[in-house]
Amino acid sequence: MNKSALLSPAPFGRLLTAMVTPFDDEGKVDYGLAADLANYLVDQGSDGIVVCGTTGESPTLSWQEQQKLLETVRNSLGSRAKVLAGTGSNSTSEAIEATKEAANSGADGALVVVPYYNKPPQEGLEVHFRAIANAAPKLPLMLYNIPGRTGCSISPSIVSKLMDCSNVVSFKAASGTTEEVTQLRNYCGSDLAIYSGDDALVLPMLSVGAVGVVSVASHLVAPNLKKLIESFLEGKYSEALYLHETLQPLFKSLFATTNPIPVKAALQLIGWSVGPPRSPLVSLNSEMKEELVKILSSLRLI
């Protein structure tokens, strides 16, 4: 088994939660609840919080809401945990503006997704990310590859070129395969901190060189995920495998439909009134909710 995760940096810790954005009964961002939820997630074991990412419904948040949400979480957590801001856009100029604002607001890093919809070629991706890195040179960046949502994928060779920017330090791998991690390791070595972007693949990705996970399930089972990662790093592979297998039904249910629909429903079930997603996303249907209740009950979460 590859122990390269032991040799790689983990600049944002091992377990990061891609936090949902709570909405009140009128559909407005509930900033007070966001602060409470962020602190709860850290109490449960999260080393870092990602705000305004995919799970945080960034496409339906205004720039003003995103900025206030980042400032709220940053101020609430203080030095208790790392705070990363989702600053990606399919417009380079907008991504630059958002990343600079994140740096000015005290973020510990920025999660910058591959541009979506306009499907730039690899040369365009290099220009895009290099411009962002150069615009906020002191802010550590986590590049984010999720081709199922963006329609294109950044190649490991381009990532390796971008590493001459000193603030390109990490990568969220959400292509759904361990091969992506292997190729990134081949091109970039151990200096790039690779995080799994898929809860179901945490253990497989750790085994080929990832250092941790940007998780959705950690809203619910952070201690279990923390233990899984620690068990792997300590060489307790049977224990890590047991946790991996035990949590698979939950992982599957949280992605039975578009994220963050299921995790918001799950949070409601365990007592967090985070509200439904904003349109065009909808609430979890009754059949999926019934299955989610069974899984949460089996894990003694409700």
From Swiss-Prot:
Organism whose genome encodes this protein: Prochlorococcus marinus (strain NATL2A)
Entries under SUPFAM superfamilies matching the protein: Aldolase
Reactions the enzyme catalyzes: L-aspartate 4-semialdehyde + pyruvate = (2S,4S)-4-hydroxy-2,3,4,5-tetrahydrodipicolinate + H2O + H(+)
Ranges in coiled-coil conformation: none
Protein name (database record): 4-hydroxy-tetrahydrodipicolinate synthase
Biochemical pathway: Amino-acid biosynthesis; L-lysine biosynthesis via DAP pathway; (S)-tetrahydrodipicolinate from L-aspartate: step 3/4
Binding site for pyruvate: T55, V214
Active site: Y144 (proton donor/acceptor), K172 (schiff-base intermediate with substrate)
The encoding gene: dapA
